[in-house]
């Protein structure tokens, strides 16, 4: 094991300095590094996921609410959430996660910056999961899609003050930062819907459902994070 670690260190130093590095060695290192990095990201993603399932108040609460919606077992107990429906994998574009009603939740291991970014992303997708069970969302219906995106951004914690300030600094609207963030992110998500024409179309749809969806904090009593 120590020998393997030293050899990897040697190859890394050779790659970074370029000393004695042939074109074949460079290509082989980049290929090996991609595999190494993918495995490392995957391991971290599942470790963070499992930690959040145990210790995150938001994630644990959403799991409980989803389990209730899933129905009861024959003995009257609430069915447990199937954690295998939350998977980690690489994503080719800008998103950090996704939800599919038949498959479950995807966490983009190569897009997640840290454990807390994963918490926000998982919480966001769990809101979609909840909405889909409670209201049988038609994800190609722009208004229904927009409503769930507004709720997911508002309730997940991804638009809380500290996150938004880190993104925008003093250019953020301190009075409406949370609302602006939820609206902005919902518009971006709706733009990805195949039935959406462009940003103007997405903005119009989000505005139409904004009040009824932003202030609907179910299953929370209020915006928690």
From Swiss-Prot:
Record-annotated active site: 125
Membrane topology, as annotated: Peripheral membrane protein
Protein EC: 3.4.24.-
Enzyme class at the top of the EC tree: hydrolase
GO cellular component, one term: mitochondrial inner membrane
GO biological process: mitochondrial protein processing; mitochondrial proton-transporting ATP synthase complex assembly
Protein's UniProt keywords contain Protease: yes
A GO molecular-function descriptor: metal ion binding
Mitochondrion keyword on record: yes
PROSITE patterns referenced in this protein's UniProt entry, alphabetically: ZINC_PROTEASE
Compartment(s): Mitochondrion inner membrane
Keywords (A to Z) from UniProt: Hydrolase, Membrane, Metal-binding, Metalloprotease, Mitochondrion, Mitochondrion inner membrane, Protease
Signal peptide (UniProt feature, chain positions): none
Binding site for a divalent metal cation: 124, 128
PANTHER family assigned to the protein according to its UniProt record, in alphabetical order: MITOCHONDRIAL INNER MEMBRANE PROTEASE (PTHR21711), MITOCHONDRIAL INNER MEMBRANE PROTEASE ATP23 HOMOLOG (PTHR21711:SF0)
Cited function: Has a dual role in the assembly of mitochondrial ATPase. Acts as a protease that removes N-terminal residues of mitochondrial ATPase CF(0) subunit 6 at the intermembrane space side. Also involved in the correct assembly of the membrane-embedded ATPase CF(0) particle, probably mediating association of subunit 6 with the subunit 9 ring.
Family label: Belongs to the peptidase M76 family.
Name of the protein described by the UniProt record: Mitochondrial inner membrane protease ATP23
